[in-house]
Amino acid sequence: MRHAKRGRKLGRDAAHRNLMLGTMAGQLITHGRIKTTEAKAKELRGVVDRLINIAKRDDLHARRQAVKVLKDKRVVRHLFEEVAPDLDDRTSGYTRILKLGPRQGDGAEQVYLELVNHRVE
């Protein structure tokens, strides 16, 4: 039975899944919006929300925790200096999912995952 089992496997082992989610979180933080599948977006929401909450603390330990997930100090700097201060008035709900419809090749549901303060240019 699958009681109390949280999260999606996304067809990957744990190490691959964690690296993929960290990379996708970095891309979302850098660009403000990414196009992905619905399942990946729903998993990524939690990762990004946790990272932004960590970034709001803005201390050395918080930066080290963020580097552990994001693996790129430039992205961490962007998160702490630009993204987190903009979202300081919120306590959660930093992302939104916009559905785009099925992908041409395999029919997977495509979505935009974006930060709520992202301005479309």
From Swiss-Prot:
Ribonucleoprotein as UniProt keyword: yes
InterPro entries on file: Ribosomal_bL17, Ribosomal_bL17_sf
UniProt-recorded Gene Ontology molecular function terms: structural constituent of ribosome
Keywords: Ribonucleoprotein, Ribosomal protein
Pfam families, per the entry: Ribosomal_L17
Example GO biological process: translation
Keyword Ribonucleoprotein belongs to the record: yes
A GO CC term attached to the entry: cytosolic large ribosomal subunit
Superkingdom of the organism of origin: Bacteria
Protein family (similarity comment): Belongs to the bacterial ribosomal protein bL17 family.
Subunit-structure text: Part of the 50S ribosomal subunit. Contacts protein L32.
Record's protein name: Large ribosomal subunit protein bL17
Source organism phylogeny: Bacteria, Bacillati, Actinomycetota, Rubrobacteria, Rubrobacterales
Gene name as annotated: rplQ
